[in-house]
């Protein structure tokens, strides 16, 4: 097992929970990162941490990105009247804030890769992959997508 970690964006849901042991079985030391962009119920953050450690993560980090999401995306989009497909407020941009926090943590830990649990369907995989590639040179692992291919 490598001593430098792979940093996994971790929600505690089914897909990212699968990724922890899957990555460990393939020789990765896994550090999970939950980027809290707001909206968690009391105790939920602790439950996410407990889940990550139960699954074998060597460490779990929670990053508070609520203020960054508000300042960088919500306020400007609401003030600018931005709409997704001219229908509803464009407020699904937390992936970019998550990526920024994930990369900061990965770099501070000397990580060898970053990973996410996005599937091969939908826009999340593109948001994560393109955002990650635009701000760091680390390999991007997507175990769920890879096993679906």
Question: What is each of the regions a protein language model found here?
Answer:
Residues 1-149:
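ATP-dependent adenylation/nucleotidyltransferase module used to activate substrates
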